[in-house]
C-alpha cells in the first residue's frame, strides 16, 4: 500500500491505496486531518479520510497530447486558509490550478516558458499564512511567488533546482 499511517512510536496503524497509483508523487495532510495524494502518471488527486476512505478523486481521465485540458503529471498540492486546494500540474502542463474543497475548478495560471509566471516543471507548491503561493519551478531553477489569484509577486533564483517546499 502506498499510503501508510504510523504512530509516533513507529507502529503501523493502517495502510491503504493499493492498486490506485501508477506513480505516487506527493502526500499532504490538510488542516482537517484528511490525506491528499497526487499521482504523476495517472494525474489523479485523491482525498482520503484519516482512516483511508476515499472522499474525493479529482480524476480527469486520459492524458491526450499535449494534455493542456487535463491534468498531466500532477506533482504537489497545497491548502489555502479558505480550504481551497492548489495543485502543481507540472510534468507536461506547466501550470497551477485552484479547486474548491469539493473539487470544483476555480482558476488556473501558468504556461510553459522562462518568464515571470511561466514554468518549466512546477514541482512543489506551498501557501504561507499570508496567502502567498510559492511554486518550485524546478527546471527553471527558481521559486516563484504569487498571490492566490495567480498574480506574479517575484522569484528567488539562488537555490538551484528546488524540488520540494514546506511553508511555516
Region locations from a protein language model:
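Eukaryotic scaffold repeat domains enriched in small/polar residues
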Residues: 1-168
